[in-house]
Amino acid sequence: MNIFAIETSCDETSASVVLNGLKVKSVVIYSQIKIHAGFFGVVPELASRSHIENINLVIWRALSDAGINFTDFSQKIDALAFTSGPGLAGALLVGAIAAKSLACVYKKPLIPVNHLDGHLYSSLIENRSVKLPFLSLIISGGHTELVVVEDFGKYKVLGSTRDDAAGEAFDKAAKMLGLSYPGGPIIDKIAESGNPEAVRFTRPYLKGSWDFSFSGIKTALLNYLKTNPVRNEKQLNDICASFRQAVAETLCFKSFEAAKKFNLKRIVLGGGVSANSLIRKIFLETGQKNNTKVFIPSLIYSTDNAAMIGCAAYFKQKKCGLKYDNIQLKPNPSLPLENWRL
């Protein structure tokens, strides 16, 4: 089954052709980082405009890369999928309209996909050995969620962030340090040359809860910089390394404690922050020590992409069936992670 998927929830315009949920025949991603860098964050209006300007070309390229054109689209594509939320309202609308238009023209079923579902299953694209149930940690610019995935579309959300998401924490830390946007990749690169033990930032483990909180680490950095302003490259390297270490240890500790508590031997990471080199390293090493398999998507599938939407859509239609009469579906910017309904 070939699914043509579209993802426009935030600042990446992406389209992909996915066969049977696991074989990516094409994936095209247009990033808006350069557009938003000067504002040190995503500007919703600019994001929507960029999606409008690039969606047609991205769709054409994704189809072309898969050996499909608009003439044989009807024969080679079985269903359309799009990100229905959460995300920026205007951005979501662009992808939804594009997918609905194609579904109407070619009389194909339409599959709405939760963006978080995409991150949950992104590791399955390259790791077919992932078995259910598993513990999933979604870490991105807007989300930090710990979820037990009991079956496809059957979840138990253990905890989420009480304030800043992990990605937000990195972005805000970078701004305090005078670095550019997005902060996560920049801090990750600089930290490689630093000493992670130079500064002992707080680890907010929140005993008795599976929730996360990164405002404490952010405040600790702010207070440290008030009395220890950055004066040289070595100091900057050490601060970045120490901050990265604190975030990585917090995420890892919570995840493995949850896996132990719920007797789960598989942990799956997803979301843009899972691209962080130290987070990947710590999780893999801790997994080996605890006889727990850790699955992390490759970098292209860690950040927002339409292939993960196509993957989730395939398993969703297998469980819930296909619908041809849902063209009136509207995106939901605040869509929570929820169990699939038959």
Swiss-Prot record:
It is an enzyme of class 2 (transferase). It is found in: Cytoplasm. Binds 1 Fe(2+) ion per subunit. Its EC number is 2.3.1.234. It holds the Pfam family TsaD. The keyword Cytoplasm applies. Fe cation binds at H115, H119, D304. Keywords: Acyltransferase, Cytoplasm, Iron, Metal-binding, Transferase, tRNA processing. It catalyses: L-threonylcarbamoyladenylate + adenosine(37) in tRNA = N(6)-L-threonylcarbamoyladenosine(37) in tRNA + AMP + H(+). GO terms for molecular function: iron ion binding; N(6)-L-threonylcarbamoyladenine synthase activity. Substrate binds at I138, I139, S140, G141, G142, D171, G184, D188, N276. Its main location: cytoplasm. It comes from the Bacteria. Its cofactor is Fe(2+). One of its GO terms (cellular component) is cytoplasm. CDD domains: ASKHA_NBD_TsaD_bac. One of its GO terms (biological process) is tRNA threonylcarbamoyladenosine modification. NCBIfam families: gcp_kae1 (TIGR00329), T6A_TsaD_YgjD (TIGR03723). Required for the formation of a threonylcarbamoyl group on adenosine at position 37 (t(6)A37) in tRNAs that read codons beginning with adenine. Is involved in the transfer of the threonylcarbamoyl moiety of threonylcarbamoyl-AMP (TC-AMP) to the N6 group of A37, together with TsaE and TsaB. TsaD likely plays a direct catalytic role in this reaction. Belongs to the KAE1 / TsaD family. This is tRNA N6-adenosine threonylcarbamoyltransferase.
